[in-house]
Structure formats: structure tokens, C-alpha cells
């Protein structure tokens, strides 16, 4: 076949391609002409046209199977609090709890036992304070925080004659007097306090001229009522008043209605006091308050090694301190 015949045969095809290219979009969608068989005697042209316009949407397909559950997303922001709900019903009464310690017991467990302990806790002022006996009973006592280092528990005080010390056994057992002046702490209390550990004794005396005297003893204890409040005294240590108590060591307490001394008569009645008399005394600090020198014999607030049997001191204080 000659080339002119081929050209003539392909002219309509070229025109068709030109038309389709004109109608196709400007994108890379033009028809493609492919000529095959160039080496053979026959030539074959294959024309691939441009894509047609999209057809109408088909009907909606069936829903596919559910996919696997996705992982939990991050928490969202907290929402606004809702309104309060109605008050709930009252619950049932619970079982009672164990009984707690009473206030008094707690105070006893942690409270001071002596004036010296109060001093170590920072109570530096002399005055009346509450301490606790071994049976947890509270007891108000006069603490001397000034004399000889402080920490003394005062159990006897004479100062103005305002209180009568010529009393019976029951009065000396329980104690008597006034916190504002003269008093005896009570033999039961003195026993309970001195039965705890070791205590030293100090006696302070002041005459009507303002002169001070004292006597100290290494240890001091008063036995219980079954032993008639016997005096158990240690050695005399020092003091310008001299020793007028050692001779009363191991003596029983005697009052006007209970005679426990070693004399034929009742020493408490003879010398108008109450004391650890033997036969009868060299000191009588619970005797009559006679205001200094007196003509009667040995019935005043006497300390014989100090100012003798005929001088009644203005001030007498007996006190003990834990050692």
C-alpha cells in the first residue's frame, strides 16, 4: 500500500481525534492514538477516548460490618456541678465505741506528782498548785519555788496565830487551816507523798525580830495510820537552827485524844500541841502561838536548839522535796 493511500485513509481518524480533544477537559485526559503493526504490511490505529461525564449516583449500598472498638480517648473537661440532691435518710445507730479515759485519769497519767516536778516543767512561782497522789487523787499543795533551789512541798505553816493547832487525831489525819495563812496538810497526804521515793526535809524558822534560821535532814518519811504516822528521819545535814528533831526519829504521832508517846501522861495535852512526842519533846512546832518569849515552859512554837523552850517563833514552815 502506498503512503498516499494510507494518509487518505487516516484523514477521517485525525479529524475525529481533533474533535474529541477539543471536547475533552484541559487536563491530561486527551485520547491516546496507538499505531501498531508498523513493521507489517498493514497498519492498525487504536484510539482510546477521553473519560465520559460521571453517571448518576447509584443506590446506597448495604452498611458494612462494624469495625473493632477504638481505644479510649482522653477525658473531657469536668462538667459543672449539678444541684445538690435531697437529704438522705438517717443511718442506723452504730455500735458504741470503747470507753475512753476520764479527764481525771488523763491528768493523773500526765500531771505532776511533786512540787519539784512542777519546777522542772517551768512553774517557777511559789504558790498553791495541783499535784497527783499515787491513787490519782488531785491534791492542792503550797509549793516553795524560791528557798534553797525551790521545789519544796510545804506541809506545815505557822505565821500569825490565826489557826488553832491544838486539835484531835481526825483533824490532823485529814488536814486543816487556810491557804491564805496557817495550815497542816494532813497526815494521810504527808504519808502518801513521802512514800514516793526519797525526800529531804527542811525546817524554816523566823523570829519576831526577822532573824531566819533553818535545819535540813537527809531524808524524811511519815508512815501510814496503821503505824500511827511514825516519823522516819534521816541524818541532820546542816542549819543554823541546830538539830531539834533527830531525837523524835521513829516516834509515833500523838494528839490530845490519842496518846502514842512514851511518857506517863499525854504529851500533847501537857504541851498543848500535836507532834511526834517521845518523853516528851525538844521541838513542838504545832504548839501554842505565844508571840515570842513566854513564861510557860515548852508549850509554844518551840525549837529548843534554836531559841530554847521559852520562845515561840513567829514563822514556822516544814517542807520536803524529792531527791
Curated annotation (Swiss-Prot):
<dbReference type="InterPro" id="IPR020837">
    <property type="entry name" value="Fibrinogen_CS"/>
</dbReference>
<protein>
    <recommendedName>
        <fullName>Ficolin-2</fullName>
    </recommendedName>
</protein>
<feature type="glycosylation site" description="N-linked (GlcNAc...) asparagine">
    <location>
        <position position="302"/>
    </location>
</feature>
<dbReference type="InterPro" id="IPR002181">
    <property type="entry name" value="Fibrinogen_a/b/g_C_dom"/>
</dbReference>
<keyword id="KW-0176">Collagen</keyword>
<dbReference type="GO" id="GO:0046872">
    <property type="term" value="F:metal ion binding"/>
</dbReference>
<comment type="subunit">
    <text>Homotrimer. Interacts with elastin. Interacts with MASP1 and MASP2.</text>
</comment>
<feature type="binding site">
    <location>
        <position position="259"/>
    </location>
    <ligand>
        <name>Ca(2+)</name>
    </ligand>
</feature>
<keyword id="KW-1015">Disulfide bond</keyword>
<feature type="binding site">
    <location>
        <position position="265"/>
    </location>
    <ligand>
        <name>Ca(2+)</name>
    </ligand>
</feature>
<comment type="function">
    <text>May function in innate immunity through activation of the lectin complement pathway. Calcium-dependent and GlcNAc-binding lectin.</text>
</comment>
<feature type="binding site">
    <location>
        <position position="261"/>
    </location>
    <ligand>
        <name>Ca(2+)</name>
    </ligand>
</feature>
<dbReference type="GO" id="GO:0005615">
    <property type="term" value="C:extracellular space"/>
</dbReference>
<feature type="signal peptide">
    <location>
        <begin position="1"/>
        <end position="26"/>
    </location>
</feature>
<dbReference type="GO" id="GO:0097367">
    <property type="term" value="F:carbohydrate derivative binding"/>
</dbReference>
<keyword id="KW-0391">Immunity</keyword>
<feature type="disulfide bond">
    <location>
        <begin position="115"/>
        <end position="143"/>
    </location>
</feature>
<dbReference type="InterPro" id="IPR014716">
    <property type="entry name" value="Fibrinogen_a/b/g_C_1"/>
</dbReference>
<comment type="similarity">
    <text>Belongs to the ficolin lectin family.</text>
</comment>
<dbReference type="GO" id="GO:0003823">
    <property type="term" value="F:antigen binding"/>
</dbReference>
<keyword id="KW-1018">Complement activation lectin pathway</keyword>
<keyword id="KW-0106">Calcium</keyword>
<dbReference type="Pfam" id="PF00147">
    <property type="entry name" value="Fibrinogen_C"/>
</dbReference>
<keyword id="KW-0325">Glycoprotein</keyword>
<feature type="glycosylation site" description="N-linked (GlcNAc...) asparagine">
    <location>
        <position position="310"/>
    </location>
</feature>
<dbReference type="GO" id="GO:0005581">
    <property type="term" value="C:collagen trimer"/>
</dbReference>
<feature type="disulfide bond">
    <location>
        <begin position="267"/>
        <end position="280"/>
    </location>
</feature>
<feature type="domain" description="Fibrinogen C-terminal">
    <location>
        <begin position="106"/>
        <end position="323"/>
    </location>
</feature>
<keyword id="KW-0479">Metal-binding</keyword>
<keyword id="KW-0964">Secreted</keyword>
<feature type="compositionally biased region" description="Low complexity">
    <location>
        <begin position="55"/>
        <end position="66"/>
    </location>
</feature>
<keyword id="KW-0399">Innate immunity</keyword>
<dbReference type="GO" id="GO:0030246">
    <property type="term" value="F:carbohydrate binding"/>
</dbReference>
<feature type="glycosylation site" description="N-linked (GlcNAc...) asparagine">
    <location>
        <position position="249"/>
    </location>
</feature>
<feature type="compositionally biased region" description="Pro residues">
    <location>
        <begin position="75"/>
        <end position="86"/>
    </location>
</feature>
<keyword id="KW-0677">Repeat</keyword>
<keyword id="KW-0430">Lectin</keyword>
<feature type="region of interest" description="Disordered">
    <location>
        <begin position="55"/>
        <end position="107"/>
    </location>
</feature>
<dbReference type="GO" id="GO:0001867">
    <property type="term" value="P:complement activation, lectin pathway"/>
</dbReference>
<feature type="compositionally biased region" description="Basic and acidic residues">
    <location>
        <begin position="87"/>
        <end position="102"/>
    </location>
</feature>
<dbReference type="InterPro" id="IPR036056">
    <property type="entry name" value="Fibrinogen-like_C"/>
</dbReference>
<dbReference type="GO" id="GO:0062023">
    <property type="term" value="C:collagen-containing extracellular matrix"/>
</dbReference>
